């Protein structure tokens, strides 16, 4: 049984959680360089390699490809962590998308920012990130060159993923602890932090939002 399956099994047995029905981790084509790099990343993480070391691009690998692998992995684990508490994150319990120091408004860059409940905001966000990752003009495939807007797109994805963690730690940390999922959630957030800092993919403003959490990890 995988770590993900084991955790979800434990959550389901508690009888209080519904798992994201649309949770489908992004995968890399078998045999591709990204598939190989992800196997290396997962092996290092599972083997206890220091997180700060595990996020560094391996010698001889393309840095942009490595960033793509980590970005997709971070997106997948964010989905997993949210799935733990999804049953508690409802329109009634979370009418706003809040963190410890902010209320986030949804915008797709086309209309005016609007206030949404946390579950609706996160559903919109997951769909938006999926579209970015699946867009070959942003995340190229078949050894195509990476476009100029690639790094800015990754920076935006990372900042938005961090908002989901901000909500989890602010509104649902008691649930995470009760379900005994806190170690995995903390490790997932640390992976994001070390990766984003190492490749300068996160600004001080975004880091400050979670500083009170980062300082305790």
UniProtKB/Swiss-Prot annotation:
Composition-biased stretches (Basic residues): 23-38
One GO MF term attached to the UniProt entry: metal ion binding
GO biological process, one term: signal transduction
Sequence similarity: Belongs to the MOB1/phocein family.
Gene3D superfamilies linked: MOB kinase activator
Sites where the protein binds Zn(2+): 89, 94, 167, 172
GO cellular component terms given for this protein: cytoplasm; nucleus
Natural source organism: Dictyostelium discoideum
One Pfam family per UniProt: Mob1_phocein
Cited InterPro entries: MOB_kinase_act_fam (IPR005301), MOB_kinase_act_sf (IPR036703)
Superkingdom per UniProt: Eukaryota
Protein name per its UniProtKB record: MOB kinase activator-like 2
Region (Disordered), start-end ranges: 15-38
UniProt keyword list: Metal-binding, Zinc
């Amino acid at each position: 049984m995988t770590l993900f399956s084991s955790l979800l099994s434990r959550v389901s047995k508690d009888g209080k959680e519904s798992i994201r029905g649309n949770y489908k981790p992004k995968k890399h084509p078998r045999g591709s360089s990204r598939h190989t790099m992800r196997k290396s990343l997962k092996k290092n993480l599972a083997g206890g390699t220091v997180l700060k070391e595990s996020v560094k691009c391996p010698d001889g690998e393309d840095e942009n490809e490595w960033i793509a692998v980590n970005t997709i992995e971070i997106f997948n684990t964010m989905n997993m962590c949210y799935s733990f508490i999804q049953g508690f994150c409802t329109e009634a319990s979370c009418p706003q998308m809040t963190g410890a120091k902010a209320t986030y408004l949804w915008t797709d860059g086309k209309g005016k920012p609007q206030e949404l409940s946390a579950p609706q905001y996160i559903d919109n966000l997951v769909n938006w990130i999926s579209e970015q990752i699946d867009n070959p003009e942003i995340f190229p495939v078949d050894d195509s060159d990476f476009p100029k807007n690639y790094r800015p797109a990754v920076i935006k994805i990372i900042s938005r993923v961090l908002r989901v963690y901000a909500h989890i730690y602010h509104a649902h940390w008691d649930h995470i602890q009760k379900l005994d999922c806190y170690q995995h959630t903390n490790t997932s957030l640390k992976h994001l932090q070390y990766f984003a800092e190492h490749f300068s993919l996160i600004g001080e403003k975004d880091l400050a939002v979670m500083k009170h959490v980062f300082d305790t990890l």
